[in-house]
């Protein structure tokens, strides 16, 4: 138990992914539970009983947040997720509540079990009590580092990058305008071709029908005039 607690505490703060932070936090919690079981006191048994439920909730929330990040961005590395928390709000919220509860931050559900563990250790071994506190703080530091990467603001362009950005935007607009003009020109050509085919056909039909129609009209007018007369 002491080895697992020490290993998890020494390595947790330096991790650069949420998956490794969870692994180190799990090592710390298993080590703490084994130490409490070795004490064999009533207070340590109560700490184990409450701690199992608190740790299950904490790990569940932390795993939920990490799962959301992996599903959306395909990674849980801090460097790959910089600023991702501003686009996926629920992930940093779940990681913050679960991770800080796992570290035993006051005001979270994990603080109750952590406080009972510290009290039981304080009655027997002061060194183990300090080791447990430092290991929990190491997990908390790792979680805070990860949250800082998630909530990091998007980098603003430097003055040297600004002209390049403006040139790219202008080129994009010119390309859009060129495509629009090309589309209009293609439509006009298609309409002109359509009219060039229809107009001669209409002319031919009209030239064939018009004389006969005019003759019939003249005959009708003449007949009408004769009848009324």
Residue ranges and their predicted role:
Residues 85-91, 143-229:
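Cytoplasmic/organellar membrane-interface segments at the starts of transmembrane helices
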